[in-house]
């Protein structure tokens, strides 16, 4: 019997960087105001690329040296797809020539990558099989650029992993996926309204967020989900090498580390450079750490996400 493992990670960010000072030219804000509340200094904004374009770049990097025909599954976690249909994953499939892959998008907002990784691990049962799991977002198209409470937070980007079913021992050790639909009103984007026939197609609603409630949710529920995940695996907090969090707000990461009574060094962050890239953030962070040699084969890692739904998720993985 063989088991699924993360064989490779990759990331892709648009070239165009927008600093806090740049934003202060178009809205009432400042570098100090943004940094002290979020930890963000800059973010990448797509100019001509859509979500599928970012995801395709990641997929091509992941499949370098691999036979695309051997890919069984492509999942793209996104809340900012190119269109309602076709799925972003189908566009990725066509671009890389993965003709045998089942393809679909998964929408769980900022928990999406962890959700997608768990789904892929459970679906990938063919020995030697491969899956592409990608988080990709162009959130800039859902932002109200006059609303400083949300516009300063988000950036565009993509990250992903190649999962292979060829390990001789388990690498995906435990997971917890949670949803709290009664809290949905605290974070939303992209709503449409029913239109009487033959009413016009309406624009998508921009981000709306109750920051105080989302902060409260994240700093309480994420530690609970992580603790439950580790208990399922019989692993202690101190045994985990890295906690790779959804990069929403540096203050949230610090508070979760404090609640778990763990050193902040175990919670690496790149939010200062990229902002909140939603479903892409954990994958971007993992790829960046792997490139720098800070996440290596054998490391015990917790991937954790939280966001719209509201949702929270944790996955314990041996790299």
Curated annotation (Swiss-Prot):
Q: Which reaction does it catalyse?
A: malonyl-[ACP] + acetyl-CoA + H(+) = 3-oxobutanoyl-[ACP] + CO2 + CoA
InterPro entries tied to this protein: ACP_syn_III_C, ACP_syn_III_N, FabH, Thiolase-like
What terms describe the molecular function in GO for this protein?
A: 3-oxoacyl-[acyl-carrier-protein] synthase activity; beta-ketoacyl-acyl-carrier-protein synthase III activity
Give the range the annotation lists for the signal sequence: none
Enzyme Commission (EC) number: 2.3.1.180
Catalytic residues as annotated in Swiss-Prot or TrEMBL: 110, 246, 276
Q: Where is this region: ACP-binding?
A: 247-251
SUPFAM superfamilies according to UniProt:
Thiolase-like (SSF53901)
**Where found in the cell?**
Cytoplasm
Which Gene Ontology biological process is one annotated for this entry?
fatty acid biosynthetic process
What assembly does the database describe for this protein? Homodimer.
What's this protein's function?
Catalyzes the condensation reaction of fatty acid synthesis by the addition to an acyl acceptor of two carbons from malonyl-ACP. Catalyzes the first condensation reaction which initiates fatty acid synthesis and may therefore play a role in governing the total rate of fatty acid production. Possesses both acetoacetyl-ACP synthase and acetyl transacylase activities. Its substrate specificity determines the biosynthesis of branched-chain and/or straight-chain of fatty acids.
Q: What is known of its domains?
A: The last Arg residue of the ACP-binding site is essential for the weak association between ACP/AcpP and FabH.
Entry protein name: Beta-ketoacyl-[acyl-carrier-protein] synthase III
Q: Which organism is it from?
A: Lactobacillus delbrueckii subsp. bulgaricus (strain ATCC BAA-365 / Lb-18)
């Amino acid at each position: 019997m063989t088991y699924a493992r993360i064989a490779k990670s990759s990331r892709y960010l648009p070239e165009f960087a927008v600093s806090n000072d740049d934003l202060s030219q178009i809205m009432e804000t400042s570098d100090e105001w943004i940094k002290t509340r979020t930890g963000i200094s800059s973010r990448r904004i797509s100019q001509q690329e859509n979500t599928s374009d970012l995801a395709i770049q990641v997929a091509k990097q992941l499949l370098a040296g691999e036979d695309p025909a051997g890919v069984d599954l492509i999942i793209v976690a996104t809340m900012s797809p190119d269109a309602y249909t076709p799925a972003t994953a189908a566009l990725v499939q066509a671009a890389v020539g993965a003709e045998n892959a089942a393809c679909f998008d998964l929408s769980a907002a900022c928990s999406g990558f962890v959700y997608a990784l768990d789904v892929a691990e459970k679906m990938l049962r063919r020995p030697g099989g491969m899956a592409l799991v990608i988080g990709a977002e162009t959130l800039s198209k859902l932002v109200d650029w006059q609303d400083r409470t949300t516009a300063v937070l988000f950036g565009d980007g993509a990250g992903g992993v190649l999962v292979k079913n060829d390990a001789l021992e388990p690498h995906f050790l435990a997971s917890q996926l949670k949803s709290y639909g009664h809290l949905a009103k605290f974070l939303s984007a992209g709503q449409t309204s029913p239109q009487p026939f033959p009413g016009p197609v309406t624009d998508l609603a921009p981000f709306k967020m109750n920051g105080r409630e989302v902060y409260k949710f994240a700093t309480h529920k994420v530690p609970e989900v992580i603790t439950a995940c580790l208990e399922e695996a019989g692993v202690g907090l101190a045994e985990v090498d890295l906690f790779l969090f959804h990069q929403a707000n540096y203050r949230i990461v610090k508070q979760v580390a404090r609640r778990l009574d763990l050193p902040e060094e175990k919670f690496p962050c790149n939010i200062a450079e990229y902002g909140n890239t939603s479903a892409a953030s954990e994958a971007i962070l993992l790829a960046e750490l792997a490139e720098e040699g800070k996440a290596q084969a054998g490391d015990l890692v917790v991937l954790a996400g939280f966001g719209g739904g509201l949702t929270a998720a944790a996955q314990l993985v041996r790299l």
